[in-house]
């Protein structure tokens, strides 16, 4: 994806579900989500356990997020082999973008998301891209 497309996406998207976020402050998923929240994005933590992270209610899956909440970006902090079911949930949930963080690469899942009409960013850090482009 080209820089101008990412910049436009980051400018118009406001709600980011962070799948695989850690409650540990030294983990990249936590620091990225904290940064995005500090920049005005609404963060929705998604992980199998926990109650709150960064002052936000933790949901155990994308499907658990109330349907009236529009998810713009699904930011994935999971191993590459764990990506396909997350992408399927993102598609069914009506997300606009699937963002796979640095080191998270799954071309087949990315292609599936694109076929469903989602934009896909793969193997890039959303925080670094925001700092660079915004």
Question: What spans do the regions from the language model cover?
Answer:
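Mid-chain, well-packed structural core segment of small domains
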Residues: 62-104
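Short, charged, surface-exposed secondary-structure boundary motifs
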Residues: 53-56, 69, 108-111, 129-134
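Conserved beta-strand elements of the Class I
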Residues: 17-19
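NAD(P)-binding Rossmann-fold cofactor-contacting core
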Residues: 22-30, 34-54
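Short N-terminal or domain-adjacent regulatory/targeting segments
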Residues: 1-12
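Rossmann-fold NAD(P)-binding glycine/threonine-rich loop
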Residues: 102-130
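A short helix->loop->beta-strand "cap" motif at the edges of active sites that frequently abuts
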Residues: 39-41, 93-98, 116-118
């Amino acid at each position: 994806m080209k820089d101008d497309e990412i910049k436009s996406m980051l400018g118009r998207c406001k709600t980011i579900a962070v799948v695989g976020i850690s409650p540990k402050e030294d983990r990249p998923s936590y620091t990225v989500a904290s940064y995005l929240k500090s920049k005005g994005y609404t963060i929705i933590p998604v992980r199998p356990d926990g109650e709150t992270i960064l002052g936000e209610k933790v949901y155990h899956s994308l499907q658990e997020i109330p349907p009236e909440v529009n998810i713009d970006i699904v930011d994935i902090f999971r191993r590459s082999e764990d990506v396909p079911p997350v992408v399927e949930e993102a598609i069914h949930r009506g997300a606009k973008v699937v963002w796979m963080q640095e080191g998270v690469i799954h071309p087949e899942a990315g292609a599936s998301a694109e076929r469903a009409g989602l934009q896909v960013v793969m193997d890039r850090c959303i925080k670094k891209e925001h700092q660079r482009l915004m």
